[in-house]
Amino acid sequence: MGFSYDRYSRMISNPVRNYWALIAGRHDTNAFSVIDAAYREPQRRYHDWGHIVDLLTKLDCLKALAVRPDLIAAAIFWHDAVYVTRDDDGLLRPDAENVRASATLFERHSKFDETDAQAIHDLIMATANHLNARATVEHYPGFSRDLDLFLDLDLSSLGASWSEFEQNLARLRFEYAWVPEPLFCLGRLQMIDTFAAHGDALYRLDETRKLWCARAHQNLARAQAELRRQVARLASSA
């Protein structure tokens, strides 16, 4: 019941339709409406339906690597369901708070059995620390690998073409439009430096490393250089 083809078939892409049809019966009837409203929020430009479609499309291509693609798909649908860049007091909201809120929202609408629900919860929570998160419980044989695949998918946009990478940076800038330019550039540079410092360990699986790692580091190096020039220019004009 949770998914209506009549209502959504003209609005959303095939990966969304197909994967939601796979897991709709393990959600309450309001779940898709909640997700749909979230990813259409006007303050989003990167963390919107485009991001979800991208991840589901890649999951579909790489599903032979997954033990439970249905659970990975559920985590994809919910992992950015709550995305707010600043709190009511105007301060930067930590990503971890959005992740926790997204996991809680999933639990509110889930009808998965207890083991599967906890696995999805842990997949979502792992996005609070992409580079260092590890499975602490093997919810099913192969869960650790599914977690690694899910996190690699979420970072796959780093290995996009340069033009898409640039567009993603612009989309993120829109989401943080309230942050002054010097602070935003410094924050982006710190994030990119962290990704770049991980070398081949940026991606966890051999298969995804071969797909995205080389291009990702080319993009990161180019972005580092451009952001450093921008930071220097902003500092000199201050």
Question: How would you name each of these model-derived features?
Answer:
Residues 2-19, 40-47, 58-68, 78, ...:
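Divalent metal-dependent phosphate-bond-processing catalytic cores, especially two-metal-ion Mg2+/Mn2+ enzymes
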Residues 21-37, 51:
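Short alpha-helical hairpin
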Residues 47, 51, 79, 98:
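Histidine-centered active-site/metal-ligand motif
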Residues 55, 95-111:
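An active-site-proximal "capping" alpha-helix that borders the catalytic cofactor pocket
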Residues 55, 69-87, 102, 122-128:
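His-Asp-centered metal-binding catalytic motifs of divalent-metal-dependent phosphohydrolases/nucleases
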